Amino acid sequence: METSDELKQRIGELSYEVTQHAATESPFTGEYDDFFEKGIYVDIVSGEVLFSSLDKFNSGCGWPAFSKPIENRMVTNHDDSSYGMRRVEVKSREAGSHLGHVFSDGPKEAGGLRYCINSAALKFIPYDQMEKEGYAQWLTLFDET
C-alpha cells in the first residue's frame, strides 16, 4: 500500500492536493484545459479510465470539460456544499480521487452535462500509446472517428 508521502512524490504536490483534499487548480492553468488530442484521460492516482477526448469540449470555464465519462459507472457523484455552494462533486470510482464537479449547463445535444475536471487529477493517454500503456480495450471508442 502506497503511503501519502509516496503518493505525493509520485503524482506531485498539486495533483495530491486536488485528488486527496479536494483542492481546485486555478482556472486556465491546467495542462488539459486547452488540449484536444485524440486519446483517453485516466485517474492520475490509479490509472482507471475516466474520459475520452471524443466527449471533451471547450466550455470556456478554465478547466477541462467533458459531456460524460466513458461509462457512467467509472465515476461517483457526491453532494458538495463547501464554500456556501451546492454542487455535485465527481470522484473516481476505484481510488475515490476528487476529480472536479458536474454541472447541468453542458451542450444540450450531448446530454446537457458539463463535467468540469481538474487537469491535475488526470493523466492523458494518447491514442497511439493506448495499447502500449495497457488500454487496448478502449481503442474501439475511436473506430468511427
From Swiss-Prot:
GO terms for cellular component: cytoplasm. Residues 4-127 form the MsrB domain. Keywords: Oxidoreductase. InterPro entries: Met_Sox_Rdtase_MsrB (IPR028427), Met_Sox_Rdtase_MsrB_dom (IPR002579), Mss4-like_sf (IPR011057). It catalyses: L-methionyl-[protein] + [thioredoxin]-disulfide + H2O = L-methionyl-(R)-S-oxide-[protein] + [thioredoxin]-dithiol. Coiled coil: none annotated. Its EC number is 1.8.4.12. GO terms for biological process: protein repair; response to oxidative stress. The active site is at C116. It is an enzyme of class 1 (oxidoreductase). One of its GO terms (molecular function) is peptide-methionine (R)-S-oxide reductase activity. HAMAP family: MsrB. PANTHER family: METHIONINE SULFOXIDE REDUCTASE, PEPTIDE METHIONINE SULFOXIDE REDUCTASE MSRA_MSRB. Belongs to the MsrB Met sulfoxide reductase family. This is Peptide methionine sulfoxide reductase MsrB. It comes from Streptococcus pyogenes serotype M3 (strain ATCC BAA-595 / MGAS315). The lineage of its organism: Bacteria, Bacillati, Bacillota, Bacilli, Lactobacillales. The gene is msrB.
